[in-house]
Amino acid sequence: MADRMGWFLRMLSYLVMVPGIVCPPAWGAAGAKKIILDTDPGTDDAMALMLALNSPELDVRAITVVPGNVTAGQGLENALRMVSLANRCDIPVAGGAEHPLFQKLITAEFWHGKNGLGNIELPKSKCKADARFGPDLIIALVRAYPHEITLVPVGPLTNIALAIEKDPGIVPLVKEVILMGGSIKGGNVNAAAEANIYNDPEAAQMVFQAGWPLTMVGLDVGDKTLFGRKQLEQLGKTHGPVNDFMYGVTKFLVELSEKFGDSGTPMYDPLAVGVAIDAELVTAPAMHVDVETRGEFTRGETVANRRNEIERNVLHHFPEGDRYVIEGLDKVVPNAKVSIDVKADKFLELFVSRLQGK
Ligand code: BDR
Ligand code: CA
């Protein structure tokens, strides 16, 4: 019996890997990385999701929705319509938090269109939402697959923070976290902060300090990956429901970028998925990152210590008055790999070819 079962599983994994024979969407290719995409869909979130679903290196185990670019309700609707378009009702899609931990929600229809998907109306979803609360689903999957799940958050970090607050025991069981957020070269919301971090700084600080392997794919590297007219034209040459939807979304974004004098749209969220596919796409040295939660001008900034040490100042009493004296350097332990450079052309080619089904 055991032999028969082994034969059956070997045949199954073979068939799954041969294109066009049998590829039940519910099963990832053998050895594919299990990911949970936590997203606020969102135009570039849509690109991230479709890249993940079209990449055999990844096995999307769940999609959890967080408010950010759009409200929680609109985000869930968008996620459901997208998985339906991709014929992937097998993937659980769960709503999560309704608002950031300690502040009011800020939504970004200004950038993402009134429905969050570049005003492209997808058909109603055939898929139903998973009844579980997003953070609970994250906990359940991490516990079901210890050391196998990679979390890919591409929105505010509220759901991830709620998951670790509820069950801190999942932290050592997560394989890694690859998040889109932050910047070490200024923000997009204001001079200091990037949107995903700004929209829930306390949650972000919890996620950065949790103590798990974490890669930050920030604004500054995303800004080096511009999807422009050349890529749009390539994507327009092939067709299919997902291909055409992606063409519409990227056209909306390219036109938007041109209105602001840019030559293309930054691939923020899809790049985080790209790094999950191939970590070599970015150069990411280890640093210690803290999230500023109080600064008057800097709330939501990711403050990265690039030297991984700080000066040790000790208070001394002198006849002329008290002062601090630098006595040495203290090591700071890195808590993140921070992306500082990216193979942009390679990534853009990967994105277009995957969306074309290659
Ligand atoms: C991030 O903010 C959102 O608008 C995008 O989806 C991306 O996740 C970029 O700052
Ligand atoms: Ca996003």
What residues fall within each predicted segment?
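Extreme N-terminus of proteins, especially the signal/transit-peptide cleavage junction
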Residues: 3, 25-32
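Bacterial N-terminal signal peptides
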Residues: 10-24
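A glycine-rich helix N-cap at a beta->alpha junction
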Residues: 82, 86-94
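A residue-level signal for conserved active-site and pocket-lining positions in enzyme catalytic cores
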Residues: 93, 207, 273
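Active-site histidine-anchored catalytic micro-motif
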Residues: 30-39, 46-81, 115, 119-224, ...
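Conformational coupling and interaction surfaces
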Residues: 31-32, 50-51, 59-60, 198, ...
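Surface-exposed loop and adjacent secondary-structure segments within mature catalytic domains
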Residues: 94-124
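N-terminal secretory signal peptides that target proteins for export/translocation
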Residues: 1-7
